[in-house]
Every structure is written in C-alpha cells, then in structure tokens.
Amino acid sequence: MSDLQDQEPSIIINGNLEPVGEPDIVEETEVVAQETQETQDADKPKKKVAFTGLEEDGETEEEKRKREFEEGGGLPEQPLNPDFSKLNPLSAEIINRQATINIGTIGHVAHGKSTVVRAISGVQTVRFKDELERNITIKLGYANAKIYKCQEPTCPEPDCYRSFKSDKEISPKCQRPGCPGRYKLVRHVSFVDCPGHDILMSTMLSGAAVMDAALLLIAGNESCPQPQTSEHLAAIEIMKLKHVIILQNKVDLMREESALEHQKSILKFIRGTIADGAPIVPISAQLKYNIDAVNEFIVKTIPVPPRDFMISPRLIVIRSFDVNKPGAEIEDLKGGVAGGSILNGVFKLGDEIEIRPGIVTKDDKGKIQCKPIFSNIVSLFAEQNDLKFAVPGGLIGVGTKVDPTLCRADRLVGQVVGAKGHLPNIYTDIEINYFLLRRLLGVKTDGQKQAKVRKLEPNEVLMVNIGSTATGARVVAVKADMARLQLTSPACTEINEKIALSRRIEKHWRLIGWATIKKGTTLEPIA
C-alpha cells in the first residue's frame, strides 16, 4: 500500500504509462493569455450582434425602425381646417390617425375575446389589477388596429392582409418573404372588448351601444351555446347590429372531426337569429392561426357605416379619468379627460362643449336638479395619435378644462358631450313601448330549460341601459305593451331611442327585453 502511495502520479498516453510532473508555468500562462484574447474577441461587436441591436451596416434597431417609418410615408399630420363636406370615413386625412368603425367582441366568459383583440391589434386590453388577478375582463377594453392589404397582385389572399397597431406608418413593406410589394391601409378599426361574465351584463350592454358590428367568439372545446353566448347574441339583436362574424376559437385543442361537429352545432344555434348566414372562421387566437383570414372578412363583409360630418356633434362617455399624478405641481395640473365614441358630427380643438346631465344634486325639498358642465376641448387623442379633429368611430379621448375630480374613476360615464346648446333634453321619467323576450337567456334552470320571462309589474325595479347610461327604473304603470318608468338618475336622451331592459334574477341583472322611448318628463337644467 505504501509503495503505491510513494509512486508519482501517472496517466496513460498512447497505451504507455507516463508520469505527471509539475505543471509547466509557461504553458499555463500561454493558456490564460489565449483565454483572455478569446474573451476580448468575444467582447468586440461582430457584424450582427443581438444584444447591441446592431445590423450589418452598423444601424441600430431604433434607427432601422425610423428609416422604415419614413420610407413608408410616416404618419402625416391632419389638416387644421379641412372641408368636411368632401371627407368620408375612408379619407386618408381621417383613417391614417383615427379608427372609423367600432367592432365589438362578444361571447361567453373565457372563450378568447381579449386574446383575439390582442392577436389582431397587438394591444393587451386586460389592464386593471382586478382583471389581471382573475384573468377576466371586468371593464370595457379598447384597442385600435390598422388593417392593410398588399398592393402586389401576386400576393395571395388571405396572406396579403395584415394588421398592426394604430401608430403604424401609412405604407409599410409587405412582410411575406420574397414579396416586393407595399401595404395599403384599407381599414382602421376600434375593438370594443366586452366582458363575458354573467354579472357584468350591464357593462356589455353599455359597450353594445357604440358597436357597428360584432365578432362572436365561440370556443370549440365547449358545447354550443353557452349561457352568455345566447345572451350576448340577443343583446346585439336588440341593438340591430346587422354585421356579425363568428369565430370558432381554440381549434388547436380539437381534432378535425370534432371541429366539424361543433361547427354544425353553431349553425343550428344561429339559425333564425341576426347571425344567420354569418361567416364562421376557425381560429386559434393564442397561436394567431387564421388571424389574416379574420382581417380579410372584416374588410370584405363589414362595411364602414355612412357618417354625417355636417350635423351637430355628439359623444357618449364610456370612460373618464384624471391624468394628473399624485403630488403634481399646481401649474402642471391638467383638466379631466372623457373617453367615448362620437355618434355623429365632428369635434375640433378649441370647440366649446357641454356635458349633460352634468352635476346631479337634490334641492332642499329632495327634488333632483342638474347643472350641465361647460368647457373647451384642449386635446383630442385616438390611442397614441394626437388629432386636430375627431369624427365618429373609435374611442376618442377628449381633454377638457373640467375639474379632474369630476372625471376621475369613471364618474362621467353615461353623460353626453356635445356642442353648447345643441344637446337633447334631460328626462327623469319616460314612457316606453316595450318588447319582452319569450324566454330568459343566460340562465340554466334545474331542468336545463330556459325560464319564461314574466310580464312587467307595477312598482318593480328594472335596470335600463340608455346609451352608455345604466340606471335603475321603477315601473310606475303598465298597460299592454306600454309602460311608464321613473328613472333613479336623470338621463340625457331622445324620443325614439332604443333602450335595453334587465331584471334582477338570482342576484344578477338579466336581459329581459328592449323598448323604445315614446315620451317623458323633461328636467330643466339649472344655470
């Protein structure tokens, strides 16, 4: 054993046992020098290095993006005072910076509505803390997208359609490998992302008030129809939306045979509804499969509605907020911002505006009174694009000189903004001509059959959606298909406007029908 310990350490080289002597200091120094040289070489920027963002000609990613932006025509400024009688919703002066059509996403909870919007627009609509924690949409989400078509005749459909964010240049290069063409902007769409949860039905109805068309999401891995699928379809039927595209989502989780069977159940479900004959597009929103086909159907099957730019402008408020950071200096404070969709007319920078009903209070006798808010428009925005004027379509942020405390946390939601002195009357009670659904939608009873809708009864409390206003209403009197409702809070509306009616069933508001306003008691605003 001791003899073995005394032996010099050795290794086998070419079959011979060779002794291992002391390490050669010179060789080690050479190795260290060689490693140092290799490290230094690695630190030198190569022709294309991912972490520095350098391209072969020394151009950074940011510089490349700027160059492509300029080559694609950039994003031209809007003219200050254009002739609105000569403009239409697809005019370059408008469509380059602002969406001109509102498309809603509707369907049952967790069927992929927000994911589809993100796949098309690249914008995450789920933003709030509560929404991110639960992974559901709670408030209405908004995202704008530009849809382009390649002008190269050899570029095949639907590959030639591509969507980008709303700040994209007007004529980018085609992204299909080997295609020399450039894209042309054909649509600028604003998506209204509605919540699918049953308890958020009133939020969905507020969103339906501004929709021009809808994408109905139906998940392929669940039976059709789910409760809110039918409830949302009834809601857009009430709003008389004629243009619907059905997206059969999550096809990546199914076999071909089951996808075809599921499609048959969709066709059976939509028979006789407003969506009868609508295209059914199989997609995977997560994998962005068939999204180019969705873009093609949006362009080909959903026309941009005609807009009248010459009449008095009106906007319904769907969001409002205070943009000031806590602790901001007094001279840096900005006025409140109202976000909403313009129904008709054109708003311009500097316009005098009126917000109705405004500040609602009660006098000494407990009688409701309204004080409209007057202000000026100081800024107009469509997402990140600043505007000189704004037309109907898309969500517009209107910067005002209004006290920001009146706007924070959606306090202006349901109000109507318009030119001073040109807004409709404020009503405290209304007389309606109503129509009830035959069966209750979105509720599964014990026998899996839908319950019948009861007739309206005096003194019962309903929820009515007038535009983006959701307010309580007590039934004062009922006769045949006419009823008189006393509103909990006053609403700025017009005769012959369509409203949605909901009743509280099992602690949730459920859609039971719709109505048309025939007349009502107006409230004179205080000066």
Curated annotation (Swiss-Prot):
Predominant location: cytoplasm
CDD domains: eIF2_gamma, eIF2_gamma_II, eIF2_gamma_III
G3: annotated segments: 193-196
Result of changing residue 203 to A: Impairs eIF2 complex function. Reduces cell population growth
Disruption phenotype: Inviable.
Result of altering residue 135 to K: In SUI4; defective in ternary complex formation, correlating with a higher rate of dissociation from charged initiator-tRNA in the absence of GTP hydrolysis
Binding site for GTP: 110-115, 249-252, 284-286
Region (G2): 135-139
Region G5, residue ranges: 284-286
Location of region: Interacts with CDC123: 515-527
Superkingdom per UniProt: Eukaryota
Entry similarity comment: Belongs to the TRAFAC class translation factor GTPase superfamily. Classic translation factor GTPase family. EIF2G subfamily.
Protein name: Eukaryotic translation initiation factor 2 subunit gamma
Organism whose genome encodes this protein: Saccharomyces cerevisiae (strain ATCC 204508 / S288c)
